[in-house]
Amino acid sequence: MSGRGKQGGKARAKAKTRSSRAGLQFPVGRVHRLLRKGNYSERVGAGAPVYLAAVLEYLTAEILELAANAARDNKKTRIIPRHLQLAIRNDEELNKLLGRVTIAQGGVLPNIQAVLLPKKTESHHKPKGK
């Protein structure tokens, strides 16, 4: 009976990623590796990369949703850096978070100072009183 290998026993379960266990799209394993290699601390807990991946995924989804709205407002189907810039700068909290960030090819927000706008003239039809 030699040479038959193992008989029976439990079949190994299909590998399940930590991202799928947490219900995330962002890679928990890669975030964990980067936290370990980045010399942020001597040890990294099991929950830290899951939490960080979830935060990064949430922020990305938020920015992409606002950028998609900006693209749709401009009648475009492709998000370009200008749409990202408009999305971030028009949102108060994202603008505060990414205030020191420069987006290449993002342009600036359209803004004209009120004093530079032409004066409002009164209507030409004044009632003539006696």
Curated annotation (Swiss-Prot):
Residue positions, PTM Phosphoserine: 2
Positions of modified residues (N6-glutaryllysine): 96, 119-120, 126
Positions bearing N6-lactoyllysine: 10
Gene Ontology terms: biological process: heterochromatin formation
PTM annotation, UniProt: Deiminated on Arg-4 in granulocytes upon calcium entry.
One Gene Ontology molecular-function label: DNA binding
Residues found modified as Phosphothreonine: 121
Gene3D superfamilies registered for this protein in UniProt: Histone, subunit A (1.10.20.10)
Residues with the N6-(beta-hydroxybutyryl)lysine modification: 37
Protein's cellular compartments: Nucleus; Chromosome
Classification via Pfam families: Histone, Histone_H2A_C
Biological function: Core component of nucleosome. Nucleosomes wrap and compact DNA into chromatin, limiting DNA accessibility to the cellular machineries which require DNA as a template. Histones thereby play a central role in transcription regulation, DNA repair, DNA replication and chromosomal stability. DNA accessibility is regulated via a complex set of post-translational modifications of histones, also called histone code, and nucleosome remodeling.
Subunit field text: The nucleosome is a histone octamer containing two molecules each of H2A, H2B, H3 and H4 assembled in one H3-H4 heterotetramer and two H2A-H2B heterodimers. The octamer wraps approximately 147 bp of DNA.
Family: Belongs to the histone H2A family.
Record protein name field: Histone H2A type 1-F
